[in-house]
Amino acid sequence: PLYAYINENAPLGFDIPDVSMFGMLKISADSHPDALAYEYFGTKCTYGEMLKKIRTVSDAYYALGVRKGDAVTILMPNTPEAVLSIYALNRIGAICDIVHPLSAQEEIKKYINSVGSKFLLTADLCCAKVSAILDETSVEKVVVASPGDSMPFVMKKLYALKTRKSNAVPADDSRYIMWKSFVKNNSARAKEYKPTGEQNEKSAIILHSGGTTGVPKNIMLSNRNFNAFGMQSIITLYDVSVGDKILAILPIFHGFGLGVCVHVCFCFGACSVLIPSFDAKKFGSTLKKYKPTMLFGVPTLYEAMVNADGVDDLDFSFLKYAVSGGDTLPKPLEDKVNA
C-alpha cells in the first residue's frame, strides 16, 4: 500500500548509510552548511553553525566524564540545548535516555536508575523534582539548561524574571552545573579524543512507553532505526529538500517527535522550528509566523488547528504535507483539515 504514495521515479529500495545519527546530520551539514538547521523563537542556526556547536557540546560532555556506552538522561522540552546534546552524545557514542520533563519525580527516579545514568541534563523547571530524588539515583552530575538559554535577549530576560522563583537551582550542591558554565569550562578542558564513527546497534536512544498495555517499558532504538526512518522519508516525501521547514511541536521524548520533527528533518537538510510547549490558543499565530512546509502531529493537534483563532483566514499554500500519526484520524476531522 505504501507504494501508492511514493513518487513513480523514486527507487523502491534504498541503502542505509553506515553512520551514526550524528553522521547523518554531518552529511547534511557538509552538503549545505549555510542552510538553516533550526529556529527557536527567532534565534536561527545554520547547519555549519550547528555542527560547530555539537562539537563544542560533545567536548564538554567528554570532559565531564561521558564515554562511549554511557547512558545520559535528558529531561528537557524541545530546545536547542536538548537537540545539540542528543547529537553531541551520539558523537561520543553515548546513549540518550529521553524522559518527559513533566513526569512525576518517582517516575524520573525509576527511569534514571533503570538505565544507570551517571549524568543528567535537565530543564531548570524540573530542578525541584530532581533535587528531591537525586540522592536515590545513580546520577553524579547534573547539567541544568533553561528554555530561555537560546531565546533572543529581551525574551530571555522576561523568561528569567517570570520563572526565577519556581526554577531555583540548588546553590550549595556541587553536582549541579549551569549550561553556560558547562559548555564554556568543560569544552575548554576537554582533551583530544576520537569520536566514535561506529554504529551502536545495541542502543543510541532510549524512550519510554506510555504504559497503555501495562507497565511502561524502556524502548531501545539504534542509529540504524533512526537513519532508516530518515531514508524512507526521503523517498516518500520526494519533493522535500533544503529550505523546507518542519514545525517541531511533537516532543523529543516521543519517537514521532524525535524521529520526524528532528532527525528526519536533518536528513533532508530542512529547518526544524523548535516549539518547547504546545499552546492550542496560539496555534494559529504560530502557523502564520513560521509558515512550515511540513506539519506532523497526532489527531488532537489537528483538532486544535481547525479550532484555532485565525486559522479560517489563513492561506495554507505554504504547506506541502500535513501528516497525522499516533492514533486514528477520525474522518470528520480529516475532512475539516482538508477543507
Task: Tell me the role of every PLM-derived stretch.
Residues 2-6, 23-46:
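AMP-dependent adenylate-forming
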Residues 17, 34-79, 83-87, 104-109, ...:
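Conserved AMP-binding/adenylate-forming core of the ANL superfamily
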Residues 46-48, 204-228:
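Conserved AMP-binding A3 loop
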Residues 51-56, 184, 219-241, 249, ...:
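Conserved structural elements of the adenylate-forming
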Residues 73-75, 82, 86, 90-125, ...:
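Short beta-strand->loop structural element characteristic of the AMP-binding/adenylate-forming
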Residues 105-106, 113, 125, 131-175, ...:
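Conserved adenylate-forming
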Residues 167-208, 215, 238-245:
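Conserved pre-ATP/AMP-binding loop-to-beta segment of ANL
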Residues 227-245, 253-294, 308:
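Conserved AMP-binding/adenylation subdomain of ANL enzymes
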